[in-house]
Swiss-Prot record:
Its cofactor is FMN; NADPH; Mg(2+). It catalyses: isopentenyl diphosphate = dimethylallyl diphosphate. FMN binds at residues 65-68, 99, 127, 198, 223, 228, 277-279, 298-299. The gene is fni. This is Isopentenyl-diphosphate delta-isomerase. Disulfide bonds: none annotated.
Length: 370
């Protein structure tokens, strides 16, 4: 099982780097419209992109979300995480790591997650999977594993990733999700670190968001449909014909990022990381205007990170930041707080969905609360 976990990490990285693993559908932000302001009444140079999130101040509202880990020192996951960490250190943005299950099963892989020597100041988020906390898990994790995952790598927070879609498709998937909320309640009430509930490409509904808020999580990474599809990744991994067919059918399963963001913002008071198909700064600005505290990216920086290209990662993120800044100038927003107050027009499929699921006018007011 332990060697299988490490092999799976290699395969996930390989397919994300070499195959088209993105959803065939959009993340929904084409239906979200910001209103151009011909007289912004601000100077572009005065725009401030800094944000506060989970008690820390960051220079940009962009987080590198968890991707990988679990290979040995000197191997690809080690190189990816160290490259991303150096970029995050330079930019003063938070960094998430990939699942640390491999580290728990094979402790010698811990160095592929350890980046403090190159990123002493980065807000670092560890990562464990929800099914390992299910009451029927083969080796059920407890608070002890959570603290080990955080403290061994000197992280500042922990993400518990919710990936039922991926697990249901994966040949060796764990679908033991009963009892996870109970486990989350114990974790949040016991540890002194922020806990982020993180989806993995299929989005979070308002109902699940309310449950997560009730058990005390500190933030939600909605990771909606429209970016990397983990059903697609598993499609390329499996050799089993039935599993491949299942993966193909569920390639585009989930809640679009824009929809998930609106639902979670309307239903809870939690900080939100909006990830899932964030491929340009205009989309990111829309997400921030819709009430996200941060936006999250992963796949766009994976390729330069795999090459050890720190400057390449920095260049991509600074490009996104400049695009966000330009949007803010064109809508007359001096800072992210003001961006959340600019007019929004929501049309098309996203509007139709939200009219059935939430009070749209109430939501448009609720986005001011963070």
């Amino acid at each position: 099982m332990e060697e299988q976990t490490i092999l799976r990490k290699f395969e996930h990285i390989k397919h994300c780097l070499t195959k088209n693993v993105e959803a065939h559908v959009t993340n929904g932000f084409e239906d979200v419209h910001l209103i151009h302001k011909s007289l912004p009444e601000i100077d572009k140079d005065e725009i401030d992109l800094s944000v506060k999130f989970l008690g820390r101040k960051f220079d940009y509202p962009i987080m590198i979300t968890g991707m990988t880990g679990g290979t040995r020192k000197g191997e690809i996951a080690w190189r990816i995480n160290r490259t991303l960490a150096q970029a995050a250190q330079e930019l003063n943005i938070p960094l998430g790591l990939g699942s640390q299950r491999a580290m728990i099963e094979k402790p010698e892989t811990w160095e592929s997650y350890y980046v403090r020597d190159v990123a002493p100041d980065v807000f670092l988020v560890g990562n464990l999977g929800a099914p390992q906390f299910g009451r029927n898990a083969k080796k059920r994790y407890s608070v002890d594993e959570v603290l080990y995952a955080i403290e061994k790598i000197e992280a500042d927070a922990i993400a518990i990733h919710m990936n039922p879609l991926q697990e249901s498709i994966q040949p060796e998937g764990d679908t033991t999700f009963s009892g996870v909320l109970e486990a989350l309640a114990e974790i949040t009430s016991t540890i002194d670190y922020p806990v982020i509930a993180k989806e993995t490409g299929a989005g979070v509904s308002k109902e699940v968001a309310v449950e997560l808020e009730a058990v005390g999580v500190d933030a939600i990474d909605i990771s909606g449909l429209g970016g990397t599809s983990w059903s697609a990744v598993e499609y390329y991994r499996t050799k089993d014909g039935e599993k491949r067919n299942l993966a193909l059918k569920f390639w585009d399963w989930g809640i679009k990022t824009a929809i998930s963001l609106a639902e979670v913002r309307w239903a809870t008071n939690l900080p939100i990381i909006a990830s899932g198909g964030m491929r340009d700064g205009i989309t990111m600005a829309k997400a921030l205007a819709m009430g996200a505290s941060m936006v999250g990216i992963a796949l766009p920086v994976l390729r330069p990170a795999a090459k050890g290209d720190v400057e390449g990662v920095i260049r991509i993120i600074k490009g996104y930041a400049e695009e966000i800044r330009n949007v803010m100038f064109l809508v007359g927003a001096r800072n992210i707080k003001e961006l959340r107050k600019v007019p929004l027009v929501i049309t098309g499929f996203v509007r139709e969905w939200l009219l059935q699921r939430i009070d749209l006018n109430s939501y448009l007011r609720a986005r001011f609360k963070m």
